[in-house]
């Protein structure tokens, strides 16, 4: 790493404090802008190993298509109705095995992908026949102003340099282009983690694993907005993400109970969102859309 001491990717401050009770997760928070992140950040090959493990163990790629199908279609419908022109060029960053690209293509988009996994890239090229770049967005050599929409769905939190990633996305978007981001909501994950931490004996008795998820970066609505503004974006809309189905992490053994838990969580947080006029956003994941 370039620095042995933690520093903030968003504002550059080194006024960083480790969070409790998150010592095991190595979570730190910037005291200036409140961005939360792990430190030290892992090397790139370790990140690749984590991504490959995710697609083979935690969330096998065969299950992704069905689990996120409804979410993908709702997002595409929203983009088509609100933002995208008739000629639609999409770049899906962290495209995995190309399921979002495939759905977009079926709806008339010209889909391109970026993926760090060799297996994912080969699958997309050989099975789906879409153009895909192996690597990360920062080093990709696309021409500026090439795309109408760039999607980073559950991806930005795993980027070692999310600010530079967003700045590169800004350059690659056409005028009035759109970036669509889905990521875990730090506020929700923190609440769940604290409940599990202080009631751990009870969850251990029921053999329920800790459901909270913290990646390299953990964004709240305010910190993702600050980062998008710093990258040059405007007209930033943040809301609770649409639901995905299933329980890929195996937290709830009953699929019916998993579905009920998700639905109740989603609609209770939606009520908070609407009754607060969009000021309280506590869903498990955020959907963020911003314009160039």
Spans of model-derived segments:
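Conserved N-terminal segment of class I S-adenosyl-L-methionine
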Residues: 1-145, 149-153, 163-166, 240-241, ...
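A short His-aromatic
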Residues: 154-158
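S-adenosyl-L-methionine-dependent methyltransferase catalytic module, highlighting the catalytic core
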Residues: 160-168, 178-291
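Basic phosphate/pyrophosphate-binding loop/patch that engages nucleotide-derived ligands
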Residues: 171
């Amino acid at each position: 790493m370039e620095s042995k001491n933690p520093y903030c990717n968003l504002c550059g401050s080194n006024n960083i404090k480790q969070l409790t009770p998150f010592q095991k997760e190595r979570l730190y928070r910037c005291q200036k802008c409140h961005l939360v992140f792990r430190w030290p950040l892992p090397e790139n090959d370790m990140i690749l190993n984590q991504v490959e493990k995710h697609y083979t163990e935690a969330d096998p790629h065969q299950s992704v298509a069905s689990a996120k199908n409804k979410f993908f279609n709702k997002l595409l419908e929203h983009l088509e109705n609100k933002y995208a022109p008739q000629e639609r060029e999409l770049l899906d960053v962290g495209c995995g095995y190309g399921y979002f690209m495939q759905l977009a293509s079926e709806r008339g988009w010209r889909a391109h992908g970026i993926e760090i996994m060799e297996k994912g890239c080969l699958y997309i090229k050989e099975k789906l026949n879409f153009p895909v770049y192996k690597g990360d967005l920062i080093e990709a050599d696309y021409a500026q102003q090439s795309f109408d929409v760039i999607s980073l769905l559950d991806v930005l939190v795993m980027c070692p340099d999310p600010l530079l990633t967003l700045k590169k996305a800004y350059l690659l978007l056409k005028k009035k282009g759109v970036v669509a981001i889905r990521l875990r909501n730090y506020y929700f994950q923190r609440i769940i983690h604290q409940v599990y931490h202080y009631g751990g004996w009870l969850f251990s008795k029921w053999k329920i694993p800790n459901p909270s998820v913290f990646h390299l970066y953990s964004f709240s609505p305010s910190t993702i907005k600050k980062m998008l503004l710093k990258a040059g974006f405007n007209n930033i809309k943040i809301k609770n993400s649409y639901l995905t189905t299933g329980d890929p992490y195996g937290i709830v053994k009953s699929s019916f109970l998993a579905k009920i838990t998700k639905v109740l969580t989603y609609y209770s947080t939606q009520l908070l969102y609407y009754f607060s006029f969009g000021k309280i956003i506590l869903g498990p994941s955020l959907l963020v859309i911003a314009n160039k």
